[in-house]
Amino acid sequence: MTNTVTSPIVVLGRGIAGLSAAIALGSAGYPVHLIGRPPATPGGLQLSPNGFRALSSLSLDKAILDKADRLNAVVIKALSTNRHLTEIIHDPKHLHAAVSRQDVMDCLVTKAETLSCIRFTNTEIHTVQLSTEKAKLVSVDGDIFSADEVIGADGPKGLARAALTGQNSMPPQPAYRAMRAEIEAAKLPTAFRRPLTLLMLGDGCHMVSYPIKGGSHINLVFCTSADKVTIGWQQRCFGLNPLLSNLTDPAISWANTPLYPAEVLPVWRRAHLTLLGDAAHVMPPHLAQGAGQTFVDAACLKVLLAEKPLAQALDQMAATRSIEVQAITKKAAASGQIMRLGGIASQARNIFIDMAGPHFMNSWLDEVWQAEN
């Protein structure tokens, strides 16, 4: 038997974006129906000052910081030789931290559960239908969810983006992959266990690592072209550097995830559907802004909800954030292109970073980290 449920607002997606949107709406007193399957959340993420400012607006900064590892620097090295290129020391007054994705999710769920106007439904949506009066979502079980407004927070390959832009407007197939692993800190050299971000630049590839879970684990992200991720890639990429030899252990489980090209949709809102998070902006991970910009989206919405009716707040959030996030997305994409330089170009890049020193790198990154959105 088909059930029909009517709600003022449905949030599609139960990941970081969906929960953040629900919290922004629920904190403003709006009844919210959060629909979707809780995603798997391995690994970690980094947060910069702009991300923490957004979390503060959502009253989430203290809870997440309690679970996070403070980072005091970014150290950049050559991946093949371990040669030190430069080091950026963070100002202690500015928060930089790393946290496990599961801890972030736990904090978001805990916050959402304190808001009585948020309800959860654990199901998979099959279809999103837009009309002039309401939006309808149909689950795989045939249940229908009708809403005055839908927040699409189900990612770049989600139904919400497809419904807003058209089924043929999905992100292009990625040419690059991120190999992600979470490893016990005790199994890695001391260099990995310091409270900092370690960026190692290679020939057509790069790796980022940082501590999470109170320093007990290290999150590693190795980015390279998809055609290089074949049998034996660990030995080829890590085997020549003694510092990285432990990473060739076949027991390490690497998650192969796509790196979609950077993209900000020009339109985030149509009819009764509004996109938020990476459904609206595909953010490369190279400046540690993926989750942070999602929190900025939600914080922007919360501020506007205190000033305007719901529909006007959604209009303004979509218009404002679709412009604001463009510069950061372009800079993240440019950083990725620099990091994945190969051959002689990669050697020239490393020489330039070494000669330019920390001031140049800090000015390049600080413009993003301190951005007032």
Predicted regions: what they are:
Residues 17, 40, 157:
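Conserved Rossmann-like nucleotide-cofactor binding loop
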Residues 158, 178-180, 205-208, 280-281:
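Histidine-centered metal-chelating micro-motifs
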Residues 85-105, 109, 182-256:
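Conserved FAD/dinucleotide-binding core of flavoprotein oxidoreductases
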Residues 11-27, 151-152, 209, 253-340:
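Conserved mid-domain beta->alpha element of the FAD-binding
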Residues 8, 31, 217:
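Residues at the starts of beta-strands that form the adenosine-phosphate
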Residues 2-9, 24-26, 48-165, 169-184, ...:
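Conserved N-terminal helical subregion
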Residues 353-373:
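C-terminal auxiliary extensions adjacent to catalytic cores
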Residues 26-43:
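Glycine-rich FAD pyrophosphate-binding loop
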